[in-house]
Amino acid sequence: MKNLEIKRHYNLDYKNTNLLKKFVSVDGKILPKYITVLKPKNQRKLSKAIKLSRIAGLLKFLNN
């Protein structure tokens, strides 16, 4: 899997599901830092945005 990154012009928001789907595995798990190559602050923001999106019903909890 290739390394992913968040560009500066992207808005890391829980409603931006197209961006968040890039950081979720096929199983529905949040990708770890060594794959996303994000700084710790951005990794935390990403995981919070994914969790909020799941609670809001925009992303699935698990992909079966």
UniProtKB/Swiss-Prot annotation:
This protein's UniProt keywords: Chloroplast, Plastid, Ribonucleoprotein, Ribosomal protein, RNA-binding, rRNA-binding
Name of this chain's protein: Small ribosomal subunit protein bS18c
One GO biological process term: translation
Alphabetical list of Pfam families matching this protein: Ribosomal_S18
InterPro entries in the cross-refs: Ribosomal_bS18, Ribosomal_bS18_sf
Organism (species): Bigelowiella natans (Pedinomonas minutissima)
Transmembrane segments annotated in the record for this chain: none
Subunit structure as annotated in this protein's UniProt entry: Part of the 30S ribosomal subunit.
Main location: plastid
Keyword Coiled coil: no
